[in-house]
Amino acid sequence: MTGCPASSRRRGFGLFFFLRLHRLLLLFLVLRGTLANKLNVPQVLLPFGREPGRVPFLLEAQRGCYTWHSTHHDAVTVEPLYENGTLCSQKAVLIAESTQPIRLSSIILAREIVTDHELRCDVKVDVINSIEIVSRARELYVDDSPLELMVRALDAEGNTFSSLAGMMFEWSIAQDNESAREELSSKIRILKYSEAEYAPPIYIAEMEKEEKQGDVILVSGIRTGAAVVKVRIHEPFYKKVAAALIRLLVLENIFLIPSHDIYLLVGTYIKYQVAKMVQGRVTEVKFPLEHYILELQDHRVALNGSHSEKVAILDDKTAMVTASQLGQTNLVFVHKNVHMRSVSGLPNCTIYVVEPGFLGFTVQPGNRWSLEVGQVYVITVDVFDKSSTKVYISDNLRITYDFPKEYFEEQLTTVNGSYHIVKALKDGVVVINASLTSIIYQNKDIQPIKFLIKHQQEVKIYFPIMLTPKFLAFPHHPMGMLYRYKVQVEGGSGNFTWTSSNETVVIVTTKGVVTAGQVRGNSTVLARDVQNPFRYGEIKIHVLKLNKMELLPFHADVEIGQIIEIPIAMYHINKETKEAMAFTDCSHLSLDLNMDKQGVFTLLKEGIQRPGPMHCSSTHIAAKSLGHTLVTVSVNECDKYLESSATFAAYEPLKALNPVEVALVTWQSVKEMVFEGGPRPWILEPSRFFLELNAEKTEKIGIAQVWLPSKRKQNQYIYRIQCLDLGEQVLTFRIGNHPGVLNPSPAVEVLQVRFICAHPASMSVTPVYKVPAGAQPCPLPQHNKWLIPVSRLRDTVLELAVFDQHRRKFDNFSSLMLEWKSSNETLAHFEDYKSVEMVAKDDGSGQTRLHGHQILKVHQIKGTVLIGVNFVGYSEKKSPKEISNLPRSVDVELLLVDDVTVVPENATIYNHPDVKETFSLVEGSGYFLVNSSEQGVVTITYMEAESSVELVPLHPGFFTLEVYDLCLAFLGPATAHLRVSDIQELELDLIDKVEIDKTVLVTVRVLGSSKRPFQNKYFRNMELKLQLASAIVTLTPMEQQDEYSENYILRATTIGQTTLVAIAKDKMGRKYTSTPRHIEVFPPFRLLPEKMTLIPMNMMQVMSEGGPQPQSIVHFSISNQTVAVVNRRGQVTGKIVGTAVVHGTIQTVNEDTGKVIVFSQDEVQIEVVQLRAVRILAAATRLITATKMPVYVMGVTSTQTPFSFSNANPGLTFHWSMSKRDVLDLVPRHSEVFLQLPVEHNFAMVVHTKAAGRTSIKVTVHCMNSSSGQFEGNLLELSDEVQILVFEKLQLFYPECQPEQILMPINSQLKLHTNREGAAFVSSRVLKCFPNSSVIEEDGEGLLKAGSIAGTAVLEVTSIEPFGVNQTTITGVQVAPVTYLRVSSQPKLYTAQGRTLSAFPLGMSLTFTVQFYNSIGEKFHTHNTQLYLALNRDDLLHIGPGNKNYTYMAQAVNRGLTLVGLWDRRHPGMADYIPVAVEHAIEPDTKLTFVGDIICFSTHLVSQHGEPGIWMISANNILQTDIVTGVGVARSPGTAMIFHDIPGVVKTYREVVVNASSRLMLSYDLKTYLTNTLNSTVFKLFITTGRNGVNLKGFCTPNQALAITKVLLPATLMLCHVQFSNTLLDIPASKVFQVHSDFSMEKGVYVCIIKVRPQSEELLQALSVADTSVYGWATLVSERSKNGMQRILIPFIPAFYINQSELVLSHKQDIGEIRVLGVDRVLRKLEVISSSPVLVVAGHSHSPLTPGLAIYSVRVVNFTSFQQMASPVFINISCVLTSQSEAVVVRAMKDKLGADHCEDSAILKRFTGSYQILLLTLFAVLASTASIFLAYNAFLNKIQTVPVVYVPTLGTPQPGFFNSTSSPPHFMSLQPPLAQSRLQHWLWSIRH
């Protein structure tokens, strides 16, 4: 924007700065004296050089203008630099000009031209002695920002040169001596600045353009490692200066997320992510990391912490760090490469484990607790430690919170409760709360916070702040009045601070009044809430330059004396967007109004008014005389002249549209003439408007005006002119308004056209062509007009034109009679040969002429046909006589042809200059126009002679080849959709997993754009070839099978992996590579075992090895399903005796074709047999004492192992016995861990030898089901027996210390260790071997190697001590073969006293250890056996090698029996088999568990010391569990895992599936009922969920029962509800009863406890006669819906009601009444008794008018005695049904006149005072007859379901309705009889 002239600005702002001008001048003078002039450097050192382009240096002064001078021009020259074309210089360029390689100096003097102050700089020129490379870092990252390297040059004294700009250097990458010999550019590369996204110094950019290198370069990392960069000076003079080297490390830009220090609470965790920066993008790195490992180091435990444990634990696989105790530790990266571990740039962070201190709230945005309705806020609950440091909140923290739902809508809440996205709903003040409650450990153990931490925050919510209007705009008016505007504000707290973002433009007052206009610019006025400045309303205010003005729509014609308001809008036009902004107020601008015709309109009152809603100013004009004028309104402000004009009463010129000049028609034809324009009807007198068309000879033509219902234009006028006789004449058209009083001089326009009526002289017939835009017309009629091609496929439209004798074309010839004919109607014909369709066509001038169209019907046959048109005559009978000489016919010959087609229609062309594609044009007329939809994609050559198109590709692109047939009816061009494409992708299709020595088909295709394949004829232009990474496979080409691909045969020759790629080149030589296909050559797939022997009903699983890795799913099938069956896991179950074959195949589905691909397959022979006999397999029968040996049952053959029969269903039982029990013990397997297996699993036992002797072991195998056919001959049992000899081991009696010998297997090794190693020199040697020296060898360093011969040797070990003493020990070494092995289990399992385990607990981790023995039971000290592990199934037990030799780790994952077999690969007979049974160790059974069930879990497992373990739960929201006692409450449907953990021993679990409760079952004690008597017995309603009848599972201990009632609170699951059954009773049950839920441990069900609330008198009165019961029901909190809700009806007996607390009797009136309301069964059980014999209570009587009212009469027997009684007398009223007991005090009153009257009058006044409205109604009724009253009373009884009875309390007078002179009605009379009169007025009531 440009402002006003400078003079205007100075006038506008002079006043603003005048008062402060002298202060600014004074400050400037002070600063001028204090701020000294300085140069940027005091000394400069420049290098000597002999090559052109000397090194420049820029010298700068801070302020002033200077002249520059050098004292030694031969050494240094100085060139001043002048800025902005002035003569002021603050900079100069120094250039070293020395020609001698010696040190020279010069002084640069800079003199300030105003103050004459002189500055000095010393400049030296010297020779470069050495150079070095300066870098900000020695480490750079792969594919990251480049590193800038700079050369620093030093002279002989070590001084640094000031600049090296312009000197040429040679940069290169040198060999790194510390790294492996690799390609020099493999680690880094040198970049130009033009290749990077960084701006270089100007001189560097210029040098790079000249392919030179300067003193600054960029290097970029390619891959990790070290590299050396070398630089030397290019100038030959400095060739002896040594090159500078720098060694750089290239690292991956890897970092931790988060990377800052973290504070954790004990038990919480944080999951780290590792990411790296690649080309500016962050990419996550998956674990495990390729080059790094994460470690926790420097564990610093807090005071009182356990130093044996770590502060935190790191999970390597997930990078999750879990805090275990207070302290701190460091999480660091460690490079796997040892040489790279010295890198300092690897990320790390510190983790602090702290205690929670307090909580804090934060709210965003704004961080102020003054919020706005409708806005969304993020409320964060932060946890801080005691040092006020924020703690990382992990997902396992639990924070409870309370945000009132009335004020907040929670849109998102995290699980831990720390992060909330809420929406403020309503205004007000509210308090939110949060508490840190617990931490959930990874084992689902919930650890409550020791000291509960709470925090609360007060929040104020207001409505949004809204300012109106939305914006303000004022024109810039520097010398005029200021514009003022009051901004309206709504919402907020009501207290605002008003600010303007630009107070020079807009000033705003504290009341919101803005003032602007004198300074141009924009400003935003903010109304900020004082309570929260972040909450504000804003309005944009613009003071802009006036660019445009316009007069808004208005009335343009007006009567004389009327006034027109011309609204004026003014705008500012944005130069960039061209958008216009209307000003709000421009009324202060002075307007000028001008008119081109003076006196027609005049300006009224100078024309300026206040702005309106749609305009910013206005003016008024008044009409003084008739006419037309141009009103111009202009404004001249700020040297800007703008104007806007409006024309009044104007019309368009009159013109003839059709015809323009002449119309030509045949006799009796019609021409439609169209005229446009002329004066419009005057708006004040439209009736005076006229128009007319006049003819010279009216008898020869007929004229009729056409009135169309909706004309195209309102000022168009249409006439139909019919020729009645031949000839020519002129037609005149006039239009205007007749003169009138208000329009005395109207305009009238006249226009003339010629109308000719003549005979036709000639005709022409041509096909109608739709010529494409821009194409030439068909050339054929010009060359050969008698043979015109037309389409044989489509009907052709033939056009007939008729001409007169002057060759003028007729406008209309529809009166002619014509006849059409075809010479060959088998080729073409006319359906109606006499008719013709007249079609109007524009000739380009706007005049339309009618042409005759006839459709030629074709029969889709090629050929030639002659078409003729004959003129028969006129359609009218009386035709002119001169038609005999007129033309009779016209002929044209047509050629019927096909449409042109392009062959082929679709093609993808390879973009290569050697490619030329030819497309044929088939059929058509032969005259074509060839176009392309896109230019520049191909070169098109149309070869007309060959009727073809040749294309040469230029650039890639998609285009359509369009061929237009110029001489056929145009329905669109013939098209060919073509695509010119470069190589986009190379595609390889093959099976990437190949078994060795097999072949697969390889297909290669080249794809262009849109994945379209190229034809293989282009492959030679692409130099396509296949390349293998290794030679483990071979490729052989095949013959072509299709035109889009090449095929090869791939043969696998060696096992391994390789990569296959396809390579091609484009025309630019760029190489394209396909996606590498990784090919795996895998070993043959095998199923194990090769043969399987089973008995019927026994199961064993087929295992697999080999095949592709990782192995795909194996699909199993069996050849004979009657012998055995196999499932998808490969588990084979025998059925009957026989053989079968199990087939296993590895297959997958091709993602592209969907076909099943079989990689490999194998088979297993299955034999199902019956056991003929059993035998005990004992590896040795002679054993030493105190040893162990396994024994197990086998079949008669070696294939009948325990795998064959030990897993049958029904199974076998094994019973073992011994002849002598004192020689050995025969114990089951796993007895070492205190497991007692059932007899079905005892196929293997362990012999424990105790004493010398001989005994026999016998086993008997029983068949549990004889029909299963498991034993041969249908036997029920088989047995076997074996003899065992136990003898004592050889021992010496003297000395007492028995020598021990080393026992080693054959061909094994053993490393000896002594206790003197490191302290003395220890050596060993073999003294003697038997039978020869090959038994054992020793290397002198303690390594024993056993040979292949069994024998013994003597070993001597010598220790030479440093203090001069030598020690020697001699031991024996025995080498023997291994006879048997034994498997033992760990850890030991302990159970509660009297309890046993028959199986391993589910989830337990087991360790199996293998020990080896010789032939007599001695255990070997070392081993060399290669063991083979086999399982009968792999789905129940996960087993693998342990962390020690000959140990296996197993995890029990499913219930069932798994057989584990171990044997020597070289000696399969040396084996051991053990059963591993897995069962639940947690009780009870959790099947059919429903929401609401309470489960008391228990287990027999204990620790070694008899202590129980710890309970844990996986989903506490599903099964809320007390971790101390192990009791849980099912709170919501789902699946949860209950864990029991005994640390260091066992951790077991059980799955609990909680089902949703279908419905709740309700019941109660039928002997009980409800009443509303206060302090009545509590009513209990029993509820059960599910289908079990009770909700308590398992046996609950007292501690568990206490946890149920105190901790778990299951009653919170249930919501109880009650409701009266009588819907007409307008009393909610919640006012009568208090209901809450509970759980009964005795019954094991939920209970709804219903208690009676205190009730008001009105409520007791209304309920006393209520006939209703009570509905009771319950709902679960988690299931709010009432679907399937069951209600139960509970009897209800209401309490009786009495509203009398006392009864007053007198001497004259000694009889009183007590009225009781109640239901009949309550009234029948009432007992009314007097406390004294002085009063007598008579029997009650019922009111005939009011049901439920009982009246008791009380009479005084002796009034004197009654008056003299010291103690009060009571009438006691009680009922056993409702357990009520009420008392009415009866007291005596002294005799007074009218006492009784006053008493009853008081009752009446009290009643009428309370029911004034009712008494008004009664007063009106009493004025009528008694019969009307009775009818009205009956009506009230009908509408009243529950009477609300008002009983006034006696003795308290109230103001009555009747005055003292009035008499009450007779039915309210105070005279006897009391029972009748009082009853009536007492019962009068209305329904509330």
Swiss-Prot record:
The keyword Cell inner membrane does not apply. SMART domains: BID_2 (SM00635). One of its GO terms (biological process) is spermatid development. The chain crosses the membrane at residues 1813-1833. It is found in: Nucleus membrane. Residues 1082-1154 form the BIG2 domain. It is a single-pass membrane protein. Coiled coil: none annotated. SUPFAM superfamilies: Invasin/intimin cell-adhesion fragments (SSF49373). Glycans are attached at N84, N304, N348, N495, N522, N812, N931, N1445, N1859. Residues 1-35 form the signal peptide. The keyword Transmembrane helix applies. One of its GO terms (cellular component) is nuclear pore. Keywords: Glycoprotein, Membrane, Nucleus, Signal, Transmembrane, Transmembrane helix. Belongs to the NUP210 family. It is linked to Spermatogenic failure 97: An autosomal recessive, male infertility disorder characterized by oligoasthenoteratozoospermia. Infertile subjects have low sperm count, poor motility and highly abnormal spermatozoa with strikingly large heads due to highly uncondensed nuclear sperm DNA. This is Nuclear pore membrane glycoprotein 210-like. The lineage of its organism: Eukaryota, Metazoa, Chordata, Craniata, Vertebrata. The gene is NUP210L.
